[in-house]
């Protein structure tokens, strides 16, 4: 169905699903291309459609990346998520709810939909810039929402600050993890009663060797109090504390993601290690949670634990 957008001097400009699909492309020529009959009609319009499409494309995709960097990037699918959300925000209020993102039955594609029509797709492995044989753990609805929110912020940063792709990838990550909305969303899901700036609690070693060995599986096989709990969430419900681990794809996006094509094998290796921790935790969750609760209660109801004033047991660094 046609969707009404509002931007610039072109109030209430109506586009169909096909045109919206074209506008998701960063390729300006493809996005604003008009067929022969469309061009004839445009000749008689007071408000030229070709100009409106150019303006709209610039609003969504910026002015391009400028000079290409030394390394090729794989950002089409993650930027498409941002472009789709940008279109949704430009739609009139009555039409914004028509824009939805769903996962397909195979859990490998995000379907970008307007009404009941799929206008485009984003492959989750291309979004993450990982190899085709990499494993993606299934996500809950809440995890998918957070995942897409992070994708939107990454896409926004790369669209409007293309210079970030010329700098160290850590600069891009800091822009994302430092985003106030992302911090709020991550903590609301993982540690709703704890603020991102919650002060650390000094480590009190009360664990046996066996307990430390059991906890090693949630930290790449190591036990180190200052980093052990950086992926662990917790919240109290009716006096009981429940623990969880951040989904590996979310951890990866926040702390390991690189858009450079040549980094695909490295990216896949990072995700594989995160998957291993995630699966090991859930395989031994009954036993691990008992130890976590013991530490939680003896450290002021927090796992933001440190030693000598130093800690990385926060969700976002």
UniProtKB/Swiss-Prot annotation:
Secretion signal span: none
GO biological process: protein secretion by the type III secretion system
GO cellular component, one term: extracellular region
Disulphide bonds in the chain: none
Keyword Amino-acid biosynthesis in record: no
Function field: Effector proteins function to alter host cell physiology and promote bacterial survival in host tissues. Contributes to replication in macrophages. Plays a role, cooperatively with SopB, in membrane fission and macropinosome formation during invasion.
Record-given protein name: Secreted effector protein SopD
Species assigned in the record: Salmonella typhimurium (strain LT2 / SGSC1412 / ATCC 700720)
Gene: sopD
């Amino acid at each position: 169905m046609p969707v009404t957008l509002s931007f610039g001097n072109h109030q209430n400009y109506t586009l169909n699903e096909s045109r919206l699909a074209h506008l998701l492309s960063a390729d300006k020529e493809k996005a604003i291309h008009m067929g022969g009959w469309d061009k004839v009609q445009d000749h008689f319009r007071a408000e030229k459609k070709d100009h409106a499409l150019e303006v709209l494309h610039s609003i969504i995709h910026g002015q391009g990346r400028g000079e290409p960097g030394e390394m090729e990037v794989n950002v089409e699918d993650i930027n498409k998520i941002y472009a789709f959300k940008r279109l949704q925000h430009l739609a009139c209020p009555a039409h914004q709810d028509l824009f939805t993102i769903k996962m397909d039955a195979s859990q490998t594609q995000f379907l970008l939909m307007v009404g009941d029509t799929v206008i485009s797709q984003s492959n989750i492995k291309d979004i993450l810039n990982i190899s085709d044989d990499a494993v993606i753990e299934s996500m809950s609805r809440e995890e998918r929402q957070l995942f897409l929110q992070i994708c939107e912020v990454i896409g926004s940063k790369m669209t409007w600050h293309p210079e970030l792709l010329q700098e160290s990838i850590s600069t891009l990550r800091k822009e994302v993890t430092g985003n106030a909305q992302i911090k709020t969303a991550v903590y609301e899901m993982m540690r709703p009663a704890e603020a991102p700036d919650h002060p650390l609690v000094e480590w009190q070693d009360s664990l046996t060797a066996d307990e430390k060995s059991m906890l090693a599986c949630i930290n790449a096989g190591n036990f180190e109090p200052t980093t052990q709990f950086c992926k662990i969430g917790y919240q109290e419900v009716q006096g009981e504390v429940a623990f969880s681990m951040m989904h590996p794809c979310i951890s990866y996006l926040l702390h390991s993601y690189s858009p450079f094509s040549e980094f695909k094998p490295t990216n896949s290796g990072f995700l594989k290690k995160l998957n291993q921790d995630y699966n090991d935790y859930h395989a031994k969750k009954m036993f691990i949670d008992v130890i976590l609760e013991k530490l939680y209660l003896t450290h002021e109801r927090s796992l933001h634990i440190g030693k000598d004033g130093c800690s990385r047991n926060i969700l976002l660094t």
